[in-house]
């Protein structure tokens, strides 16, 4: 088995926070969030990272992240391009939004030759997640089922006090595998806990704080790439007429289909670390403070890549 590699999705642009979160400094020496994820990933055993970016941010991204990380890891780049579509499809007029997380991973298909983990560039996951992910990918291969995994977080460790968040709410089977993941696009905190709405706030449903949620930290075998690629044209045929400018091909969509078809089992690994991210501009000081605290406590050196 080839060693697991890490795929970092870094082509998006923050719609709520504004700007390029993936290269916005949060550390004492100008480090960005993904520096800390990569440091944790390297300690866990990952040696190769594939950044999925856009051509237009290539120079800025390499200067901000890629060049210094290359001192410690084997760094590769893949480019998520709007016009990378199956034969017979064209980019709808006026479309600028990327095609989603599944499309981002497919951009790296030719660089992946074994098991791989997927993360967002602008989420802080904590060291525990990378340890359990690397260990799982290193010891499991596809058998009669595709053997995949994901790392879940406690909902209360992933919410923002500054506004609503979107999270994949997970339901697990008794054996710890994933039954379903449902995207809740408006989850908010309130005085009694956490709740979500699906009708613009007309009604709300409470969610327990220990509900497992997905933060897009997935572990797949190479088989996933073929499945995602084969399904893309059908997804476009179904979704382009309904929402040509904003529909997105998400990873959980393919995962759910594979579970329902009985092709895959996804082991739900768990992290009790607190997630950090900049969903809103007001979240950034909290991230800076958390990184400063972890650095002072010795979890990270001041200079990660010295």
Regions found by a protein language model. Name each.
Residues 114-124:
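Short beta-strand-to-loop acidic/aromatic patch adjacent to the donor-nucleotide binding site
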Residues 14, 124-126:
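A short, conserved beta-strand element in the Rossmann-like catalytic core
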Residues 64-83, 141-146, 157:
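A glycine-rich helix N-cap at a beta->alpha junction
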Residues 127-215:
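Conserved core of the sugar-phosphate nucleotidyltransferase
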């Amino acid at each position: 088995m080839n060693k697991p590699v890490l795929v970092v999705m870094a082509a998006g642009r923050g719609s709520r926070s504004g700007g390029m979160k993936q290269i916005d400094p949060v550390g004492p020496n100008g480090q960005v969030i993904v520096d800390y994820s990569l440091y944790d990933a390297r300690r866990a055993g990952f040696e190769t990272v594939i950044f999925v970016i856009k051509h237009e941010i290539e120079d800025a991204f390499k200067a901000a992240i890629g060049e210094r990380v290359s001192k410690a890891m084997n760094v590769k780049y893949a480019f998520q391009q709007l016009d990378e579509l199956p034969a017979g499809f064209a980019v709808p007029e006026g479309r600028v939004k990327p095609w989603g997380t599944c499309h981002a991973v497919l951009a790296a298909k030719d660089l992946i030759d074994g098991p791989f983990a997927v993360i967002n560039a602008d989420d802080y996951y904590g060291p525990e997640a990378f340890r359990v992910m690397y260990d799982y990918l290193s010891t499991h291969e596809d058998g009669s089922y595709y053997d995949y995994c994901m790392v879940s977080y406690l909902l209360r460790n992933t919410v923002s006090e500054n506004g609503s968040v979107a999270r994949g709410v997970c339901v697990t089977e008794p054996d710890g595998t994933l039954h379903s993941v449902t995207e809740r696009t408006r989850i908010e905190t309130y005085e009694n806990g956490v709740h979500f709405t699906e009708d613009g706030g007309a009604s709300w449903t409470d969610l327990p704080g220990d509900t497992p949620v997905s933060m897009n930290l997935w572990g797949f075998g190479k088989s996933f790439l073929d499945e995602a690629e084969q399904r893309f044209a059908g997804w476009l045929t179904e979704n382009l007429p309904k929402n040509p400018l904003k529909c997105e091909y998400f990873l959980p969509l393919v995962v759910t289909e594979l579970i329902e078809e009985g092709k895959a089992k996804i082991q739900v690994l768990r992290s009790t670390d607190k997630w950090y991210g900049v969903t809103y501009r007001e979240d950034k000081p909290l991230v800076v403070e958390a990184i400063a605290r972890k650095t002072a406590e010795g979890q990270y050196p001041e200079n990660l890549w010295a």
